């Protein structure tokens, strides 16, 4: 079987959960309030970056064990997990673009558009709990296969 280490994945899933809990504080903020608070913009940008990075780390760990030697872009890694039915193909397609926002936040490729980041808050709060559930289901499947 694979040498996937559940503890690596579980640790990152817990981090995603903690980050999502903090991001929920911004769930009902108005766009005007968000745009007028540089501090809130920085906090949400960082939380979105951390959520996405933890998912990327999970994806990389799983794929490195399933397809040793093959490398994927962060976007492709989400799609690949959909092909393996670890994520539903629908979720994989929906969530994969979040890796692009993460790259913009980390590397500041372009000016960061606070309107885009604002919209990403509700997206992350909807999609990443699904990601966590589907990865947890995959871990349960692995555990059952190893019993």
From Swiss-Prot:
Di-AMPylated by cognate antitoxin MntA on Tyr-109 when both are expressed in E.coli; GMPylation occurs much less often. Leads to an increase of mass of 659 Da. Di-AMPylation moves the catalytic His-107 away from the catalytic center, leading to loss of nuclease activity and thus toxicity. Probably one subunit of the dimer is di-AMPylated, the complex dissociates and then reassociates to di-AMPylate the other HepT subunit. One of its GO terms (molecular function) is RNA nuclease activity. The active site is at 102, 107. Its EC number is 3.1.27.-. The keyword Nuclease applies. A motif (Y-loop) lies at residues 107-113. InterPro entries: HepT-like (IPR008201), HepT-like_sf (IPR037038), Type_VII_TA_RNase (IPR052379). Keywords: Endonuclease, Hydrolase, Nuclease, Nucleotide-binding, Phosphoprotein, Toxin-antitoxin system. One of its GO terms (cellular component) is toxin-antitoxin complex. It catalyses: (tRNA)-3'-end (ribonucleoside 5'-phosphate)-(guanosyl 5'-phosphate)-(cytosyl 5'-phosphate)-(cytosyl 5'-phosphate)-(adenosine 5'-phosphate) + H2O = GpCpCpA + tRNA 3'-end (ribonucleotide 3'-phosphate) + H(+). Changing residue 102 to A: Protein is no longer toxic, does not cleave tRNA, still AMPylated. It holds the Pfam family HepT-like. The modification O-di-AMP-tyrosine is found at residue 109. A motif (RX(4)HXY motif) lies at residues 102-109. The keyword Nucleotide-binding applies. Homodimer. Forms a complex with MntA, probably MntA(1):HepT(2) in vivo; can only be purified when both Arg-102 and Tyr-109 (or His-107 and Tyr-109) of this protein have been mutated. The fully di-AMPylated homodimer is not found in a complex with MntA. Part of a locus that includes subtype I-D CRISPR-Cas genes. Toxic component of a type VII toxin-antitoxin (TA) system. Upon cloning in E.coli inhibits cell growth for several hours; eventually cells recover and start growing. Cleaves the last 4 nucleotides from the tRNA acceptor stem (shown in vitro with E.coli tRNA-Glu(UUC)); only cleaves intact tRNA. Has no activity on mRNA. Neutralized by coexpression with cognate antitoxin MntA, which is due to di-AMPylation of the RNase. Belongs to the HepT RNase toxin family. This is tRNA nuclease HepT. It comes from Aphanizomenon flos-aquae (strain 2012/KM1/D3). The gene is hepT.
